[in-house]
Amino acid sequence: MNLNATLFAQMIVFFVLWWVVARFVWPPLVKALDERSSKIADGLAAAERGKEALALASNEAEQELTKARQEGVQRVAEAEKRAQMSADEIRANAQAEAARIITQAKQDADQQVTSAREVLRAEVAVLAVKGAEQILRREVDAKAHGQLLDQLKAEL
């Protein structure tokens, strides 16, 4: 065989093979590679969107958690304030009740002292009358000397 004819035949076979590959094999390969590239790009984009969504959700969750903590602190502060107000109110009521009881006790004591003084005055008046009777050896008329006895009670 001739080297030129073999080389020429190989070139024709090569170009026919190249044409068949370029016409029937290469487009599906390029299409498959493009589809895979597109899927990879879509996957990367979806991953990026997911990452952004996760960051956004994480920020929102952190904000909600911070808000919940602040509300909890505020509720605790309000509860402490109400408890302090209740304690102050109870303390004020107790002080008012104690003052009322003390005032009532003082009034009762004053009334008992006044009553005891009146009883003592009456007894002293009776004793004074008896003493005067014994001194004078005569009976003093309580009706006749009522004004004098009342004056004596008032002075005692």
From Swiss-Prot:
Q: Please name the SUPFAM superfamilies in this protein's record.
A: F1F0 ATP synthase subunit B, membrane domain
InterPro entries on file: ATP_synth_B-like_membr_sf (IPR028987), ATP_synth_b/b'su_bac/chlpt (IPR002146), ATP_synth_F0_bsu_bac (IPR005864), ATP_synthase_B_chain (IPR050059)
The annotated topology with respect to the bilayer is: Single-pass membrane protein
Keyword Zinc-finger recorded: no
Give the record's subunit note: F-type ATPases have 2 components, F(1) - the catalytic core - and F(0) - the membrane proton channel. F(1) has five subunits: alpha(3), beta(3), gamma(1), delta(1), epsilon(1). F(0) has three main subunits: a(1), b(2) and c(10-14). The alpha and beta chains form an alternating ring which encloses part of the gamma chain. F(1) is attached to F(0) by a central stalk formed by the gamma and epsilon chains, while a peripheral stalk is formed by the delta and b chains.
What this chain does, per the entry, is described as: F(1)F(0) ATP synthase produces ATP from ADP in the presence of a proton or sodium gradient. F-type ATPases consist of two structural domains, F(1) containing the extramembraneous catalytic core and F(0) containing the membrane proton channel, linked together by a central stalk and a peripheral stalk. During catalysis, ATP synthesis in the catalytic domain of F(1) is coupled via a rotary mechanism of the central stalk subunits to proton translocation.
Q: What is this protein called?
A: ATP synthase subunit b
Q: Which organism is it from?
A: Polynucleobacter asymbioticus (strain DSM 18221 / CIP 109841 / QLW-P1DMWA-1)
Q: Which gene does this sequence derive from?
A: atpF
